[in-house]
Swiss-Prot record:
Signal peptide range: none
Pfam families the UniProt entry points to: Pro_racemase
SUPFAM superfamilies associated with the record: Diaminopimelate epimerase-like (SSF54506)
Organism the protein comes from: Brucella ovis (strain ATCC 25840 / 63/290 / NCTC 10512)
InterPro entries linked to this entry: Pro_racemase_fam
Alphabetical list of PANTHER family matching this protein: BIFUNCTIONAL TRANS-3-HYDROXY-L-PROLINE DEHYDRATASE_2-EPIMERASE, TRANS-3-HYDROXY-L-PROLINE DEHYDRATASE
Any one GO MF annotation of this record: 4-hydroxyproline epimerase activity
Protein name: Uncharacterized protein BOV_0353
Recorded family membership: Belongs to the proline racemase family.
Length: 342
């Protein structure tokens, strides 16, 4: 075999959502901070295209690049690559990265609990891993500060009319809409329709509402989170959600950043307080167990510090190669499986 590059990957998924991890073969990108490094990856696109596009990737795949941390508090940094974005943070991907670091021995596992500090592009995250028999069985992540932006904002959608939405940030930016407003239910059989209408709502929200992070250069809404009503038992709230990810796929997990954004909205509306828990359920029925740990402030905005908890499993190892005669060094996308990102 001949190859001009070899990239070593450990496959992983968190509650159904793929979050593979590059563990070797890629040098750290330029940048003084992990955020700057992630902007290089986003703008350059060479690595993104190689690992995400067909024939080596697919629209279902997210890939994380391990990098040396820039913050002295952190043991490892990571950069998240999604089909259409290189985001500040991801709950499912941070759970995958933590699991791979421990299960593969890159960071030494301590049973029954391992504590780690990781550096995402969006900031420092604290990780607590419940470990047994050489396996990280559950990962809890203190997410970056999360906040509600707009509440009960009118949004005009072609074919639907005016719907009421919230916008919020939970490590990434969301427009949040109740499924009943768009005449849908969150179930696997409606996945294609949910993804398509979700991307349509995201586009409209960017055009009509917009978003700007108070501290980071993040000036767009990334995702539409479609929700069903929250139920409550004591101090535990439970809610089903699904997140439409551009170009048009559904997150298979409950979306950790989405759960964080939803908790921020619930808190802003007086429906959730510090110390209460939230169980987010995905389109597959998998769960993230979350907690609104405390209330704080971010850039003059009321915010929360959320903790998200879930499980991940290693699915295999692989090496991606590039033969010098390969006509597709950057891969390709066809609209039969890669929906048009209009």
């Amino acid at each position: 075999m001949r190859s001009t590059k070899v990239i070593h990957i450990v496959g992983c998924h968190a509650e159904g959502e793929v979050g593979d991890v590059i563990v070797g073969g890629v040098a750290p990108p330029p940048g003084e901070t992990v955020w700057e490094q992630s902007r290089f990856i986003a703008n350059d696109e060479t690595l993104r295209n190689f690992v995400l596009n067909e024939p080596r990737g697919g629209v279902f795949r997210h890939v994380n690049l391990l990098v040396p941390p820039k913050d002295p508090r952190a043991q490892m940094g990571f950069i998240i690559m999604e089909p259409a974005d290189t985001p500040p943070m991801s709950g499912s991907n941070s759970i995958c990265v933590s699991t791979v670091l421990l299960d593969s021995g890159i960071i030494a596992m301590q049973e029954p609990v391992t504590h780690m500090v990781l550096e995402a592009p969006g900031g420092i995250i604290e990780v607590e891993a419940e470990c047994r028999n050489g396996k990280a069985e559950r990962i809890s992540v203190r997410n970056v500060p999360s906040f509600a932006d707009r509440l009960d904002a009118p949004l005009d959608i072609t074919g639907l009319g005016t719907i009421m939405v919230d916008t919020a940030y939970g490590g990434d930016s969301f427009v949040i809409v109740d499924a009943a407003q768009i005449g849908m239910k969150i179930e696997p059989g409606q996945a294609r329709e949910l993804a398509e209408i979700g991307v349509k709502i995201t586009k409209a929200a960017n055009e009509q509402l917009g978003f700007r992070h108070p501290e980071r250069d993040w000036r767009h809404i990334s995702f539409c989170q479609i929700t069903e009503p929250v139920t409550r038992e004591g101090d535990v709230l439970t809610g089903v959600n699904t997140v439409a990810i551009r170009p048009a796929k559904l997150d298979r997990s409950p979306t950790g950043t989405g759960c964080s954004a939803r908790m921020a909205v619930l808190h802003a509306k007086g429906q959730m307080k510090a110390g209460e828990r939230f169980i987010g359920k995905s389109v597959l029925g998998t769960e993230f167990h979350c907690r609104l740990d405390k209330v704080l402030e971010l850039g003059g905005k009321p915010a929360i510090s959320p903790i998200i908890s879930g499980r991940a499993w290693v699915t295999g190892t692989s090496q991606l190669m590039l033969d010098p005669s390969d006509p597709f060094p950057h891969g390709y996308r066809l609209s039969d499986t890669w929906p048009r990102d209009e």
